[in-house]
Curated annotation (Swiss-Prot):
In the N-terminal section; belongs to the histidinol-phosphatase family. NCBIfam families: HAD-SF-IIIA (TIGR01662), hisB_Nterm (TIGR01261), Histidinol-ppas (TIGR01656), PRK00951.2-1 (NF002111), PRK00951.2-4 (NF002114), PRK05446.1 (NF003937). It comes from Haemophilus influenzae (strain 86-028NP). It catalyses: D-erythro-1-(imidazol-4-yl)glycerol 3-phosphate = 3-(imidazol-4-yl)-2-oxopropyl phosphate + H2O; L-histidinol phosphate + H2O = L-histidinol + phosphate. Its cofactor is Mg(2+); Zn(2+). The keyword Hydrolase applies. This is Histidine biosynthesis bifunctional protein HisB. Residues 1-173 are annotated as: Histidinol-phosphatase. The gene is hisB.
Length: 362
């Protein structure tokens, strides 16, 4: 069985027009940024299969010839760069037809399932829509939801290849595992600081899971977080104790700090202006400046954002300054987690062998 990437076409490989959601002319054909370099890096490890819904293909509203011309040019372009797809699987039906082959249904992939043609543990669906995520669930594999800003092709390749981005000095891999058990929570955190990859995060708080994934993704490392907390009361203990366990794991994985950059700074992120400054100083401190209009984003209390970073700073013995301005609370919180991840990525990067302190210790 071969590791396989089942890849959506419109909005993932190529840009999807927001006017009519059809690529029916050469003028509309536009590759997504960095898709060719990413696929070139991935092709040694994965087989590629395109799986696409094309509403009304073959009808007067979307003639087959109008589809074929830009599609064939796209395929020829990929092939000219050394990228080939084993198959192109297309559902031509509209949602109201309720067919069996339209994503997230799996009939298009029946032969892959019956003949065990893909490695369940090492195959992924990559697409920009929730239906792509649901397709992965129906296949029993994992999904990576493409987004040109939040999860672009560079990040996807980095995740799938597990490439080292923080250990330029080629020191021994930095790993830590922390188990924290209290009356309120049971938490296990594993961190691979020098290995990017797909993160397994389950805290029971969906928005919080997404935020933790942002830290690891933009930090250039891989982590697993499993938490069972007293969510029947609220999410406070889950968020706080996860921050404490994560901070402890980061501190352990970083180790004696010899050779690290120590400092990090980044701004802005997304349409919000999020600033983060970090010093792995051994002296815990937090300066947090953010105002939220809503009490909750999804299942996450906005007031816990500051508490998370405060708990994290004191657990990992770091100085953290965070500031964000913007209009959308969801985007503001997400930009803070992403900015922290990017800043942490700089600070944990190994650049030599010296202790980054005039005192000789951190």
């Amino acid at each position: 069985m071969q590791p396989t990437l089942f890849i959506d076409r419109d909005g993932t490989l190529i840009d999807e027009p927001k006017t009519d959601f059809q690529i029916d002319s050469l003028e509309k054909l536009k590759l997504e940024p960095k898709v060719i370099p990413a696929l070139l890096r991935l092709k040694a490890k994965y087989r590629f299969v395109i799986v696409s819904n094309q509403d009304g293909l073959g009808t007067d509203a979307f003639p087959q010839t109008n589809f074929d011309k830009p599609h064939n040019v796209m395929m020829a372009l990929f092939e000219s760069q050394g990228i080939t797809f084993d198959e192109v699987l297309i559902c031509p039906h509209k949602p109201e037809e309720n067919c069996l082959c339209r994503k997230p249904k799996i009939k298009l992939l029946d032969h892959y399932i019956r003949k065990n043609l893909f490695d369940i543990d090492r195959s992924f669906v990559i697409g920009d829509r929730e239906t792509d995520v649901q397709l992965a669930e129906n296949l029993g594999i994992r999904a990576i939801q493409y987004d040109p800003q939040k999860m672009n092709w560079d990040l996807i390749a980095e995740k799938l290849l597990g490439e080292t981005v923080t250990n330029c000095g080629k020191r021994p891999p930095r790993f830590a595992e922390v188990i924290r058990q209290t009356k309120e929570t049971d938490i296990k955190v594993q961190i691979w600081l020098d290995e990017a990859g797909v993160n397994e995060i389950k805290t029971g708080v969906g928005f919080f899971d997404h935020m933790l994934d942002q830290i690891a993704t933009h930090g250039g490392f891989r982590m697993n977080v499993q938490c069972k907390g007293d969510l029947w009361i609220d999410e406070h203990h889950t968020v706080e104790d996860t921050a404490l366990a994560l901070g402890q794991a980061l501190k352990q994985a970083i180790g004696d700090k010899r050779g690290i950059a120590r400092f990090g700074f980044v701004l802005p992120m997304d349409e919000c202006k999020a600033e983060c400054a970090l010093d792995l100083s051994g002296r815990p401190w937090i300066k947090f400046n953010a105002c939220f209009k809503r009490d909750k984003v999804g299942d996450f209390s906005t007031e816990l954002t500051e508490h998370f970073f405060q708990s994290l700073a004191f657990s990992m013995l770091a100085t953290i300054h965070l500031n964000v301005t913007g209009n959308n609370d969801h985007h503001k919180i997400e930009s803070l987690f992403k900015a922290f991840g990017r800043t942490l990525r700089q600070a944990i990067r190994i650049e030599g062998n010296e202790m980054p302190s005039s005192k000789g210790v951190l």
